[in-house]
Each structure stands twice: as structure tokens, then as C-alpha cells.
Amino acid sequence: MENTAQAVKSKIEVKNLNFYYGKFHAIRNVNMSIRENKVTAFIGPSGCGKSTLLRTFNRMFELYPGQRAEGEILLDGENLLTSKTDISLIRAKVGMVFQKPTPFPMSIYDNIAFGVRLFERLSKGEMDERVEWALSKAALWNEVKDKIHQSGNSLSGGQQQRLCIARGVAIKPEVLLLDEPCSALDPISTAKIEELIAELKHEYTVVIVTHNMQQAARCSDYTAYMYLGELMEFGATDQIFVKPARKETEDYITGRFG
């Protein structure tokens, strides 16, 4: 795996990462390289630390008291965990979509425009173009173009999640984090999200947390298996699912554990 992986540029380098909820040591000495324009999946049983790890990539944990990260997370060589790094710039470069669709209580149009207005000064025409572009990227434009000024909450669950993805890409980030984006969706909506992920990786580096191992196998280029806060195995998805190096990984993937 490493020979193949090294041919692909690393977008995010994680070095000696430890994470704490108060005194609880939740992530232990994680080292990994997230490849550019690839999909990386984090798998593992509930409570293993995969969502916690994901949220260190844009310092989302800082919204909650008592949580802290130690080590380095390098985005194109810049350590995101230093106090010198502007948190607003991190959030502009690293977008995030959560498990439950979370449209803002405003129109579909304003859901997309909201984040853009924080970082850019666009004319009305430019904003209209950006909104259409983002909704098109999320394969949603044709479904909502005639009701763009209706509430985002009027959409179905699957449409709401694609709206959140459109909102994430509207600010043109470099990395998109997806925290179990399909867990609350029906199979048809899930299939649309998976198709969307395959398209998004051509322009973004995508990291997805999923409990669905079939989804990880279908969608990702690389897979990380975590257990009790430790990175047990990380490699090309084909290798992880067909010939894992560790018995613990095989036991989890085959359903004998977890």
C-alpha cells in the first residue's frame, strides 16, 4: 500500500495526535496521511474515536470546553493546531457535513449564500451563480431551482443532506469532512450521496466517517480502522477489505467483532 500511496500527494498529515475529553485520553498517538483528491473512510465500533478524529481536522472540538488536542495536523504543511492559525480560515478550507441534516432556518438560497458572505464579497449576480454552482455540485439544482426561495426545511431528508453538502462546497474548501452523512437516510438517498462523493473527490479531498462497512468499501480509496482511540490499520481500501494486515481488522470487517 505505501508504495502506491506515496505516489499520491498528501493533503493532511497527522503526527503524534492525542486528544482528551477532560482527563479521558480519547485518541492515542495517531499518525496518518490523508491523500489529496481521494476518499478516506474511518471505520470502527461506536466510541472508537473516529468522529473525534474527524473533528480535529477543523478544530470543531474547540466549541466545547474541556476538550484539547496535542500533536500536529498539517494541511499542506501548515499546522492547524497552533494558536497562530486563524480558525475562520481553517473552516473556510475544511468544510464539514454532520450526521443529521442541519439546514439553517432560512431559504434554500440563503442556506448556500450564508457561508459565502462570511468570506467573500460577491455581487448579486455572482452570488446567484455561486448558489447554482454549489447546488449543481450536490446534484440538487434541478430539484430545487423553481423553489429556491422556499425554506430549506421544506426539503426531504435526503435533499436536506445534499443541501448541507452544497452549503459546504459553496465556500470552495479544499477538504470536505462527512460525519456519517447517510446514517439517517433511506437507501435511495444514500445511493445519491455515494454517487455525489465519487464526483466530489475530483475537486476535493474527502474524509468520511461511516458505520456502514459496505459503504466504506464502495466509496473510499483508503480506509482507517480505529479501536479504543488507536489507529489499528490504515491502507488502501481494497487491501483493508480483502487482505488486512491485522487479525483485529479482519475480525471487525467480517463481523466477528464490533
From Swiss-Prot:
Keyword ATP-binding in record: yes
Sections of the chain in a coiled coil: none
SMART domains xref list: AAA
The ABC transporter domain, residue ranges: 12-253
Protein topology in the membrane: Peripheral membrane protein
Database matches in Pfam families: ABC_tran (PF00005)
GO annotations of cellular component type: plasma membrane
InterPro entries with a match to the protein in the record: AAA+_ATPase, ABC_transporter-like_ATP-bd, ABC_transporter-like_CS, P-loop_NTPase, PstB-like
Enzyme Commission code: 7.3.2.1
Keyword set includes Secreted: no
Entry's Gene Ontology BP terms: phosphate ion transmembrane transport
Binding positions for ATP per the UniProt entry: 44-51
Gene3D superfamilies per the UniProt record, alphabetical: P-loop containing nucleotide triphosphate hydrolases
Main location: membrane
A GO molecular-function annotation: ATP binding
Catalyses which reaction(s): phosphate(out) + ATP + H2O = ADP + 2 phosphate(in) + H(+)
Enzyme class name: translocase
Keywords assigned: ATP-binding, Cell inner membrane, Cell membrane, Membrane, Nucleotide-binding, Phosphate transport, Translocase, Transport
Transmembrane segments: none
Cell location: Cell inner membrane
Subunit structure: The complex is composed of two ATP-binding proteins (PstB), two transmembrane proteins (PstC and PstA) and a solute-binding protein (PstS).
Role played: Part of the ABC transporter complex PstSACB involved in phosphate import. Responsible for energy coupling to the transport system.
PANTHER family linked: ABC TRANSPORTER I FAMILY MEMBER 17 (PTHR43423), PHOSPHATE IMPORT ATP-BINDING PROTEIN PSTB (PTHR43423:SF3)
Protein family per UniProt: Belongs to the ABC transporter superfamily. Phosphate importer (TC 3.A.1.7) family.
Protein known as: Phosphate import ATP-binding protein PstB
Higher taxonomy: Bacteria, Pseudomonadati, Pseudomonadota, Betaproteobacteria, Burkholderiales
Gene that produces this protein: pstB
